């Protein structure tokens, strides 16, 4: 399972395992996660909507000659206020009460207008 951001993301990681993504209020970020829907996997994001807005949630199935339904899920977020905003993704399966896996991202958003005036 790979996770990437299509925005400027150097792969920095906090001591608690959270991946750090730096952005500005003007630039949305994308987080890509692999899902195997044949197994019933589904990534569920938890975040504070006062700090981040979810702009898109897309799924791209990987074509193959078999009945397996796996692919890449893309979540696109935009920061609505400056600061560090945590996004927790839990891989859920319909018949389980606990998460199969977790991914944590800290999105640090700066206000580009405050840089210009400084």
Q: Which residues fall in each region the model found?
A:
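N-terminal edge beta-strand
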Residues: 2-31, 36
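Short, solvent-exposed loop/linker segments at beta-strand-coil boundaries, enriched for Pro/Gly
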Residues: 39, 47-63
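Glycine-centered tight-turn and secondary-structure capping sites
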Residues: 77-85
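Beta-sandwich strand segments
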Residues: 95-102
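Low-complexity, Pro/Ser/Thr- and charge-rich linker/hinge segments at domain boundaries
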Residues: 109-118
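Beta-strand-rich extracellular modules
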Residues: 90-94
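Aromatic sugar-binding surface patches on proteins
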Residues: 67-74
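Short, conserved beta-strand segments of beta-strand-rich sandwich/propeller modules, principally
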Residues: 30, 84-88
């Amino acid at each position: 399972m790979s996770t990437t951001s299509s925005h400027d993301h150097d792969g920095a990681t906090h001591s608690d395992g959270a991946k750090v993504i730096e952005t500005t209020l003007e630039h949305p970020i994308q987080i890509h996660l692999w899902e195997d829907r044949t197994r019933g996997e589904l990534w569920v994001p938890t975040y504070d909507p006062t700090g981040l807005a979810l702009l898109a949630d897309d799924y791209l199935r990987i074509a193959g000659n078999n009945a397996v339904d796996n692919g890449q899920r893309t979540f696109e977020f935009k920061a609505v206020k400056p600061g560090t905003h945590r996004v927790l993704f839990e891989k859920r399966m319909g018949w389980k009460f606990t998460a199969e896996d977790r991914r944590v991202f800290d999105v640090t958003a700066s206000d580009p207008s405050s840089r210009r005036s400084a």
